[in-house]
UniProtKB/Swiss-Prot annotation:
Species per Swiss-Prot/TrEMBL record: Eremothecium gossypii (strain ATCC 10895 / CBS 109.51 / FGSC 9923 / NRRL Y-1056) (Yeast)
Gene that specifies this protein: RMT2
Designated name of the protein: Protein arginine N-methyltransferase 2
Disordered, as annotated region: 148-187
One CC-aspect GO term: nucleus
Function: S-adenosyl-L-methionine-dependent protein-arginine N-methyltransferase that methylates the delta-nitrogen atom of arginine residues to form N5-methylarginine (type IV) in target proteins. Monomethylates ribosomal protein L12.
Length: 413
């Protein structure tokens, strides 16, 4: 073990500034990277000049320190302050906040295991580093967002969890109605969730308790979301006008939230849906015949732009829940929402951003707050404890791995 790696095991107690900070700073100033991993050290000691590959794990000093901490509550206040300074120093010298170690664990996972969760200064410092890194990455990429591990943040895959998707995936050509001339092949297994054009050409199947892509079994929507949708439906209309209430849901899926919105008795209930299989289901279930329902067929990027240009329809509540879209799409949606929402209206969405890991979920919670503030809007969250964690039977990949849900409620300040 190198001197740097040994130092961050916090071998002596109490943890004091004099015992750790000068030596840490000297090591980093000497040129040892703050991202120097145990895997790199092992490769060096074996004489492997190439070192570990990009696909290998990255057990950084931050991981080692997180593993070495005592259980939450066992650090004195003074020791906690020193540990924060150690974290600050590592970040100042370029430590990455989101590497995965030899157990495929994030530093945030290790802090949570020790009991340092939301509200604790050490955990919040890691979240702050994640927010800063992601916003900087967005600037470097010229506005394009690459979330967490380099994959796009997906609203598709329902939850927006970071996924390893191909850099590109060709989809079959579509006719003028948007239908595919052929089904995506097995090579396109992740393209369905990564690219909306591919998704819209992919056959869907309604099975008990879920809507999935027929061949790949990607979860588009599942009935474990019912309690979330019940809360969301009541939330977005709580500031409704007494005489007239207009609501918009973007993405019908299984129609869970639309059923709850109908119980709120809106004057007009707009539903934007682009997938032909879902539209066919809506027609069979009689949604087209409901006098208070307006179906907007097509991508929201097209239909909502026309509504905005028309300038006659404004909403008390807007909800967004689509498949195979990314956070970059949400940023585009925000531009439309501010023009379509009433002054006292409420916007919300299915919040699975980063929900494959608790720390990533908390990072994106902050990022949404910051992004909405640029529009003069506030984002407040209600925490919903999930009574029963989702099961993923008959679904290829989970899209939500946290034991609670942050329901966003966004409105003008």
């Amino acid at each position: 073990m190198s001197l740097l790696h040994h130092l961050v095991t916090l071998p002596s107690r109490p943890i004091t500034r004099d015992a750790y900070l000068p030596q840490l700073q000297n090591l980093l100033r000497s040129g040892i990277p703050a991202t120097y991993t145990l895997e790199q050290l092992a490769a060096y000691e074996k004489g492997d000049e190439e070192g570990p590959g990009d696909e290998d794990t990255n057990t950084t000093p931050l991981h080692i320190m997180a593993r070495s901490l005592p259980e939450a509550g066992q650090l004195s206040e003074a020791e906690s302050e020193v540990v924060l300074e150690i974290m600050d120093t590592l970040f100042q010298y370029g430590a990455g906040w989101n590497f995965l170690d030899y157990e495929q664990k994030h530093a945030g996972d290790l802090l949570l295991e020790k009991g340092y969760g939301p509200g604790d200064a050490l955990y919040e410092r890691l979240v702050e580093a994640g927010v800063a890194a992601e916003l900087l990455l967005r600037k470097v990429n010229g506005g394009e967002i690459e979330f967490l591990d380099g994959s796009d943040t997906e609203m598709g895959d329902k939850g927006g969890s970071a996924r390893d998707v191909p850099a590109s995936a060709d989809s079959a050509p579509a006719d003028s109605a948007g239908h595919s001339s052929s089904e995506p092949t097995a090579v396109d297994a992740d393209a369905t969730a990564a690219h909306q054009d591919t998704y819209l050409q992919t056959e869907l199947e309604y099975i008990p308790g879920a809507l999935v892509t027929k061949h790949n079994r990607d979860g588009v929507m599942m009935d474990w979301e019912t309690d979330i949708m019940r809360v969301a439906a009541a939330s977005i209309v709580k500031n409704r006008e007494p005489a007239e209430c207009q609501v918009l849901n973007i993405g019908f899926g299984m129609g869970i939230i639309d059923g709850f919105l109908q119980e709120q008795r809106p004057t007009r209930h707009y539903i934007c849906e682009a997938h032909p299989d879902v539209l066919a289901r809506m027609r069979r279930e009689g949604w087209y015949e409901r006098p208070d329902v307006v179906i907007l067929e097509g991508r929201w990027q097209d239909t909502l732009s026309r509504l905005l240009d028309d300038g006659t329809v404004f909403f008390d509540g807007i909800y967004y829940d689509t498949f195979s879209e990314h956070y970059t799409d949400m940023l585009e949606l925000y531009d439309l929402v501010v023009g379509l929402i009433k002054p006292c209206g409420i916007f919300s969405f299915f919040n699975g951003l980063g929900a494959d890991r608790q720390v990533c979920y908390d990072v994106y919670r902050r990022i949404v707050e910051l992004d909405m503030a640029t529009y003069g809007m506030t984002c407040e969250y209600t925490t919903i404890d999930l009574r029963q964690l989702p099961t993923w039977d008959n679904v290829r990949r989970s899209y939500f791995n946290c034991d609670h849900y942050y329901h966003p409620e966004i409105s003008f300040q």
